[in-house]
């Protein structure tokens, strides 16, 4: 068996409007599909980032009253999402202008590249990595 690539990552959010604003208007994801699922009384938002073979989809499910993360970030399951950027420092500055705080920039001990973390509106850790 040979897997070609990761097609998408799915996350559950507690507030659809906040999550949509954060991922689309602040992080620059493109909306692929947006559907209200009447039978479940929730929203499913499919987003995309990257181009061509580097594109990946993020599926957002807005569930009513989801349980909070057990702890951060060390829990079974998804630990964090990491985004490749050309310039961590410039990206951190852009996020700061939008009121989004990042941890101090540090050097990844394995890749020797600059990296940092910040959090989405539900506290999901997000990484920036050069």
Annotate each predicted stretch with a short phrase.
Residues 1-18, 78-81:
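N-terminal beta-strand motif that seeds the catalytic metal site of vicinal oxygen chelate
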Residues 10-12, 48, 82-84, 129:
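Short hydrophobic/aromatic beta-strand micro-patches
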Residues 5, 41-43, 77, 112:
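Exposed loop/turn and edge beta-strand positions of beta-sandwich/beta-sheet ligand-binding modules
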Residues 32-33, 42-43, 65-71, 104:
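A short, acidic/glycine-rich surface segment
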Residues 12-55, 97:
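Core segments of cupin and vicinal oxygen chelate
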Residues 1-2, 46, 92-130:
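Vicinal oxygen chelate
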Residues 71-77, 81-89:
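Mid-chain, well-packed structural core segment of small domains
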């Amino acid at each position: 068996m040979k897997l070609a690539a990761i097609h998408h990552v799915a996350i559950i959010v507690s507030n659809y409007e906040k999550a949509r604003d954060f991922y689309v208007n602040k992080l620059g994801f493109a909306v692929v599909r947006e559907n209200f699922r009447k039978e479940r009384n929730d929203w499913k938002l499919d987003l995309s980032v990257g181009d061509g073979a580097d594109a990946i989809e993020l599926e957002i499910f807005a569930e009513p009253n989801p349980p909070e993360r057990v702890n951060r970030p060390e829990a079974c399951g998804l630990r964090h999402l990491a985004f490749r950027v050309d310039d961590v420092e410039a990206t951190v500055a852009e996020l700061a202008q939008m009121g989004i705080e990042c941890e101090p920039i540090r050097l990844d001990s394995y890749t020797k590249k600059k990296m940092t973390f910040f959090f989405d509106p539900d506290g999901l850790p997000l990484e920036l990595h050069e």
